[in-house]
Amino acid sequence: MNEIIFSVTSAPEGGFMAQALCHSIYTEADDWIGLRAAVREAVLCHFDEGKGPAMIRLHRVEEEVLAVS
């Protein structure tokens, strides 16, 4: 496996939530630096040694609603 992709969203109570797209890996943290560390740790725990991805891609998704009138 070469890469694993996480979808990252803002948590309603603050901080961030991350979910892997093709694996059952979920984690959260209070800030971006903490999230990066939490995602890396979750990936290392999820896969057997030598079986995990070489890279982790964090795809941050933000939604904003704008009023037209």
PLM regions with names:
Residues 1-5, 33, 37-69:
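Short, charged, surface-exposed hinge/linker loops at domain edges
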Residues 2, 21-23:
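Short strand-coil-strand connectors
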Residues 7-20:
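Short aromatic-glycine-(Arg/Gly/Cys) micro-motifs in beta-strand/loop hairpins
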Residues 10, 22, 60-63:
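Non-catalytic surface loops within mature trypsin-like serine protease
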Residues 16-18, 28, 37, 66:
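Short acidic, gly/pro-rich beta-turn/loop elements at beta-sheet edges
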Residues 23-33:
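A short, exposed loop/beta-hairpin motif centered on an aromatic-Gly-Thr core
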